[in-house]
Every structure is written in C-alpha cells, then in structure tokens.
Amino acid sequence: MRLLGAAAVAALGRGRAPASLGWQRKQVNWKACRWSSSGVIPNEKIRNIGISAHIDSGKTTLTERVLYYTGRIAKMHEVKGKDGVGAVMDSMELERQRGITIQSAATYTMWKDVNINIIDTPGHVDFTIEVERALRVLDGAVLVLCAVGGVQCQTMTVNRQMKRYNVPFLTFINKLDRMGSNPARALQQMRSKLNHNAAFMQIPMGLEGNFKGIVDLIEERAIYFDGDFGQIVRYGEIPAELRAAATDHRQELIECVANSDEQLGEMFLEEKIPSISDLKLAIRRATLKRSFTPVFLGSALKNKGVQPLLDAVLEYLPNPSEVQNYAILNKEDDSKEKTKILMNSSRDNSHPFVGLAFKLEVGRFGQLTYVRSYQGELKKGDTIYNTRTRKKVRLQRLARMHADMMEDVEEVYAGDICALFGIDCASGDTFTDKANSGLSMESIHVPDPVISIAMKPSNKNDLEKFSKGIGRFTREDPTFKVYFDTENKETVISGMGELHLEIYAQRLEREYGCPCITGKPKVAFRETITAPVPFDFTHKKQSGGAGQYGKVIGVLEPLDPEDYTKLEFSDETFGSNIPKQFVPAVEKGFLDACEKGPLSGHKLSGLRFVLQDGAHHMVDSNEISFIRAGEGALKQALANATLCILEPIMAVEVVAPNEFQGQVIAGINRRHGVITGQDGVEDYFTLYADVPLNDMFGYSTELRSCTEGKGEYTMEYSRYQPCLPSTQEDVINKYLEATGQLPVKKGKAKN
C-alpha cells in the first residue's frame, strides 16, 4: 500500500519533529517504511489497536502523545488547551468546544518500523456504539484507567465489550501526577470488579507532584523522560529506596503470569529463574489468551510513560495473523443453517476479498465508509459486492484516514483499515469481490435506545434540511432511531441518553443550519405479562368469493427477567393442521401486534409466543389469514392476562466530597434508587446505585446544587425491571389522557 508522495507528506507537516526539541530519534521516513523486501508489509509489522476508557481518563491526550512521539504530528495540542486548537483526533468542532470525543477517529502511525492503526474512541456511555464498532474490527486494545477514579462505570461497559469480541488488551493507568492518584487501588479494582488476573509491569517513582518516572520490572531499570516534551527516554539504575519494592512486585508479576501460562508455570515450580525473553514471551502468550492483563503506568499530560506503552503494544498485542476472524456463510436455499468460515490473513490476493463496513461518516470529502479488510486484496478501481443489498460498487478512490485528513492509497490487504468514498451502504455491511458469495461478517452488537424526545425544526421552511440531516445521522449511528408519531403528529428521535440526543440537535443546527425545538424526554417503557396465559383464536372473514381463515392455539409465556427486552416465537406444532409455510405468517402477526401494548401504548417485550396447534382451510387459508390470526391470538391472550409495565434501570455512579454524603444518599433515595455499593478515597466518596431512568431527569442540576458544584455522576443502562405501582399508574393515566380516554386534570397541560 502506497502513501502520498514524500512532498505531500511533508506538506501535511508529518514525519518530522522540530530540531529545537532535542529529538534523539531518527526522523521517520513514511514512504520507505511502507515497504518490505517483498513489496508488502508483513502481518508481523502491523498492529490494529483501539484506545478505550471511562470519560475523561485521558484517551485523546494519550493518542496525541503517541502521534507526536512517533513523528506523525509536529506539535502537540491539548484537548482543552489555551491555544484553542484542540487535539488532532477531536476533529469535529463540537468535540473541540466541549473537550470530549463524540466519534471514533481513525489514524495510523509508525513505531520502530511497525505500522500501528489506532482508533480513539469516546468515553461517554451515550456514544457506546462508537466503542462497540471500534472493538469489533480491532485486534487489540489499550484500556486507560484514571489513577484517581480507578475502575468506573463506563470502564466496566468497555470491559464487557472487549470480552464479547475477545479482544486482548493492555491497561495504562494514567494521571499519576494528579492529587489523590493511587495506582495500587486501581489495580485492586481491576482484580475485584473486572475479575482480571492483572499485575504491574512497572512501578512509579513518586506520585502526584513528585512523579519523576517509572521502574521497568521486566528489564529491572529506571526510566526517565527528559526534554521539554518528554521525548528523550533515559535509562538508569533503580533508586536504592525502591529496590525492595521492585523485587517484590517483579515476583508478584512472575507468579500472576505463571498462573496463566503453562511454560512459565513449569519453570516456576522447578524454581528456575526465567530470563527476560522467557518472561516477555510468557506475558505475550497469556495476554493473547486474555488470561493475563499487563498494567503500565504514566501521565500522558506530563509526557511520562508513553514510549514504554508503545513498546508494549508491539511486544504483547497481536498482529492480524494471530487473531482468528470468522465469516458466516448463509446458504442460498433460505435454510437457517449457517457455516462459520475462518478468514485467511495472508497479505496477498490468493483469497477473495472480504471486508466489514464498521462506520459511516459524511465529511468534507463526501460519504465516507470505514472498512476493515479481513481477507484478500482490494485495489483502486476494483468492483466489490455488498452481500446484504447484492449491489455492485466500483471503487473510485481508496484512502487511509488521519483524523479528518486523508491520504490516497492504491491497494489494501487483509489486516488494513481504510476509507471508501461515495458508497451507499449501512454500518455492519459485508463487502466481497465475488457476487452472491453469501458471506457476512458477524454483525456489530447494537443496544436498544432507552430515551426519546419529540423534535421539530424551529422554522417550517427548514423541513428539507431537517430530514436530510436526520437521514444522515440514522445511517451513521444505528443507536439513533427516528419515527413519526401519527397520534401526536410529531417526529420522535430515540437514543442512548440525553447528551446523545442533545449532540444531534446541536449538529443539525451547526452542520445543516437547522435549529430545532425539542420536547420533554420520554422514557422507553415496555409492557409484559406476569404469568402464562393460553389462547385459542380463529380468524374468519367471508365476504363472497375467496375468504380468509386461520386458527391458532397455544400459550403466551413471560420470559426470564434477563430477557425482558426480547420477543421469542416457538413453533411446537405437529402434523399439518397449520402448514409449515404459514408458520412465519403467525410469527409476523405476533411481532407486528407487539409494537403497541394495551396498557400504555408502549412496546410489548419479554414474551414467548408458543404455537401448539391450529387449523386451516384448503381454499380460504393464506398468509394474510395467519398474520391476522397471530395478531388476534396475542390480543386475546393479553385481554385475559395480568400486565405490568417495565422501565429501564440505570447503573449510576456518583463521586462527591465526603461532607456531602448525606445529601447525595438522600437524593438517590428520593429518586427510588437502590444503593448497591460505596467506595472512598482521600476526601471523596463514590456511590453506586441502581436508579430508574424516569427518575434521573434533572439530576445533574440537583447534584451540582447540593455539592456546591463539586459532585459529578455517570450512568449507563443496566436492565429492565417492573416499575413501582405509582409509576405504572402515572404512565397509564398519561396515556389515557393523551388518547382522550380520560379527561385532562385541571391545571395540567396535555403532553
């Protein structure tokens, strides 16, 4: 794969660091290091990594340091720096203004002749789909923890996502220069809260204001970071006062790795002293198996500990050939039988191309599609096929992205991440170079939205801009849903949280010149039944000529609490009372009828429709008959069932000074929260609670006022559970008032 010419790279200000900084490393020659003796970079020289963490742990600052030390950018800027430039990876104007990452940004760089593709992801729970997409296509990751905050609620979400996609990772405990930093506590939380077999690879030399450098436990040496920007790495003897601690921690590291690696375990039992290379190989094997997590230390803001972390990425994280990726082969005869096929990671054209579109974006270059290549070769000018739409696409342009800038390339191979232009597709689509191959990569896990608001443009003349912007956002973000409420004649948008929807409202105004009016947030309640209920329903329609006839018998069952968001259909029929070609029609009728519940108009979920028997007519039975029979059977069962309303419960984490503990606990109790745990460090306490989302609106204002602006909180979706009787009554009454079945109470405006 070629880059732009050397002159173009120089024009972009890449590949060179100012001589005045006393840079001690060789200048990176981008053009030269794109090639090996065979003409293509081997897999061993590639790493695809993501940087993920809780909000404000320092992910973007860390990425900025990585780009600077590898010669990718000539000057560093802070996320909320005084120069107003903002970090390179925060390319959206809104990101620079707020100092948070909203979209994943992709870039690539070089470290010690290895190509590193990096995706910097958001930490805020509302943008969790960006993290989900990044981890799906990466081979390894760096989990960033704050030395003060430790393991926080979004850290646990990222940990679950890494587990889902089996991503090996390193941990970097950042912000050792901050007051109250406690890396030992963060490590303990990794072991207790995340259940990781983790150990320090380094120990700090001083903490907070006295943080001078780190001690490398593998090589048994001290590492200092000199120069104005920490760019000169200097090695020295371990200070005398830290030698005993370094010996103890090194022994603990060997024990942890020996517990998860058989070869090192045997050496440990035989009381042999492992060499440095033995230890490194054992750590690599255990990290790739996800049975051990190496923990590194530093402070990205103070430019300490970043270069050893880069060395560790090369040393311990997998290259594309060490990760097994599977595609699903769907049979063409419409059978539900699926076969898993292992992708070949060879960097040549000996196998057909397979790639996954994991992110869509409309930038200044038009529609951008980010694709991870899993197999084969893709060249500029090639024709590829979208296996979902069965459409051919010719590639006019192929590029690699650096935040919002791009560099054209001629070809990409398995293991590369690239951007395609002007391609009509959806996030999660699979591309191949053979028509009707039936291959698809496992799709990205998309969580359901939990909050909705009504939205309309302030000016009626902006309707075209509004629909254009909303259409683009729904293509880019699968967690952002839009529908038109026919009863209230309004457009309703749904997403993962208030911030998520607020950001889209602001983007409509900034990017499309369409200011919007938003209504009050609405929670995505669900309805379900509390006990099994039988049904026996016949749909009959005779109006002269061919009629409609379908009979279904069975039982409607509630699902277990962990499956409250699901709907299941089970066919337990025998014989030919209901011909098999009509069973999918019954399922469709059931699913269609679940869109609106009888109690409050919200969706039905947590149900299993068990079809046991039925009847058909030789002439009058058809697909529509059994769709209507499925709908009628559900309505009949619900009329005889006891229903309850389910509400989303959020896992809330509040951090505030100790003197406000009483007020914070009282506030959570008032909001019907259940306190699940408590932590304390220095003068601050952390409260963990499960609180209904419906009761969390306006909490940020209350928390600020009761803690004098010193408290902060984060929350993420946890589960659905039956709501309180008072909440259920309130939700039902609001629905009856809105539909005119109940008079609106005096002094209360109709919602």
Swiss-Prot record:
UniProt similarity note: Belongs to the TRAFAC class translation factor GTPase superfamily. Classic translation factor GTPase family. EF-G/EF-2 subfamily.
Modified-residue entries (Phosphoserine), positions: 91
Coiled coil: none
Transit peptide, start-end: 1-36
EC numbers for this chain: 3.6.5.-
SMART domains: EFG_C, EFG_IV
Keyword line: Acetylation, Elongation factor, GTP-binding, Hydrolase, Mitochondrion, Nucleotide-binding, Phosphoprotein, Primary mitochondrial disease, Protein biosynthesis, Transit peptide
Residue span(s) of domain tr-type G: 44-321
A GO biological-process term: mitochondrial translational elongation
Name by which UniProt lists this protein: Elongation factor G, mitochondrial
Location of the protein in the cell: Mitochondrion
In-chain residues carrying the UniProt-annotated modification N6-acetyllysine: 175
Gene source species: Homo sapiens
Pathway involvement of the protein, from the record: Protein biosynthesis; polypeptide chain elongation
Record's keyword annotation contains Disulfide bond: no
Binding residues annotated for GTP, in chain numbering: 53-60, 120-124, 174-177
GO cellular component: mitochondrial matrix; mitochondrion
Reactions listed under catalytic activity: GTP + H2O = GDP + phosphate + H(+)
GO MF annotations, alphabetized: GTP binding; GTPase activity; RNA binding; translation elongation factor activity
PROSITE patterns noted in UniProt: G_TR_1, G_TR_2
First-listed, main subcellular location of the protein, grouped into a coarse class: mitochondrion
General function of this protein: Mitochondrial GTPase that catalyzes the GTP-dependent ribosomal translocation step during translation elongation. During this step, the ribosome changes from the pre-translocational (PRE) to the post-translocational (POST) state as the newly formed A-site-bound peptidyl-tRNA and P-site-bound deacylated tRNA move to the P and E sites, respectively. Catalyzes the coordinated movement of the two tRNA molecules, the mRNA and conformational changes in the ribosome. Does not mediate the disassembly of ribosomes from messenger RNA at the termination of mitochondrial protein biosynthesis.
